[in-house]
Amino acid sequence: MSKYQKKSDGELKRTLTKLQYDVTQNAHTEPPYTNEYNRHYEKGIYVDITSGEPLFISTDKFKSGCGWPAFTKPISQDLIANYRDESHGMIRTEVRAKNSNSHLGHVFRDGPEEHGGLRYCINSAALKFIPFAEMESAGYGEYLKLFKESN
């Protein structure tokens, strides 16, 4: 069992904002461009807002112009589940956190070719950012090595 456990629905309703709950639990999409992490490039780690599980690191984030945070890859493919999404008259690939089953966003094949060609377009409301300087004290010290590997 993972050390990162999703909270109960009641606890999620008490601790998340309405937008965070709607995005993660009801697969809604937050408005583009005005969300918290769209233009956020501080060094650190992005974790699942519902479970705390690490999902993305800042060194894999890039300016895509799509209006939401965009990453070239998750920390590990084992953390992500992909599903076919035919909503809104489109065919897309939905991205969910595998452990908590929280909706994160979508993945597209128009990312930087030199980094694999994928663009993980993720709702800020599904994420919590842990600054690099606070990772150890927040319990994410084991992920500090990812920053050394990516330099």
Curated annotation (Swiss-Prot):
The EC number(s) given in the record are: 1.8.4.12
A Gene Ontology molecular function term of the record: peptide-methionine (R)-S-oxide reductase activity
Q: Does the keyword NAD apply?
A: no
**For this protein, what reaction is catalysed?**
L-methionyl-[protein] + [thioredoxin]-disulfide + H2O = L-methionyl-(R)-S-oxide-[protein] + [thioredoxin]-dithiol
**Which residues act catalytically here?**
C121 (nucleophile)
Keyword line: Oxidoreductase
Q: Which Pfam families match?
A: SelR
Q: What class of enzyme is it?
A: oxidoreductase
Q: Which InterPro entries match?
A: Met_Sox_Rdtase_MsrB, Met_Sox_Rdtase_MsrB_dom, Mss4-like_sf
The question of whether Membrane is a record keyword is answered with no
Gene Ontology BP, a term: response to oxidative stress
So which domain of life are we looking at?
Bacteria
- List, for all copies, the residue spans of the domain called MsrB: 9-132
Q: Which family does it belong to?
A: Belongs to the MsrB Met sulfoxide reductase family.
What's the protein name? Peptide methionine sulfoxide reductase MsrB
This chain's source organism reads Mycoplasma pneumoniae (strain ATCC 29342 / M129 / Subtype 1)
